[in-house]
Design a protein with these regions (language model features):
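Acidic-enriched and Gly/Ser
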Residues: 1-105
């Protein structure tokens, strides 16, 4: 059965992890917020991760093993409780998605 899990990504390799996990058929989600920065004296808006270095993934461990996900380029490890990767409640993920959509409009 598919569940959401939380991954820790290697430093500055979140994009690489998303690309490689997508190739394996794993749904990835990392919420982003729009922030204003001053670059070379100009104010610009850019997207930054809400949780830097962390990403949510949705997959079925019977189809794709934890080891396969963990050994994907860009992924450091699962967030675990003991030896078992910790699942994340779907309501939390959908709430984050809803808030992110509301910020864009």
């Amino acid at each position: 059965m598919k569940d959401w899990y939380l991954l820790y990504c290697k430093r500055s390799e979140q994009e690489r992890a998303v690309i490689n996990l997508d190739r394996q058929g794993v749904e990835c989600y990392y919420p982003q917020v729009t922030v204003q920065k001053i670059v070379r004296g100009k104010r610009i808006e850019c997207a930054e991760p809400l949780f830097p270095g962390y990403m949510f993934v949705y997959f079925d461990p019977e189809d794709i093993s934890y080891t396969t996900i963990r050994s994907t380029r860009g992924v450091a490890n699962f967030i675990r409780q003991g030896a078992t990767p910790q699942t994340v409640q779907p309501d939390l993920i959908y709430g984050l998605m809803m808030n992110e959509d509301n910020e864009e409009h």
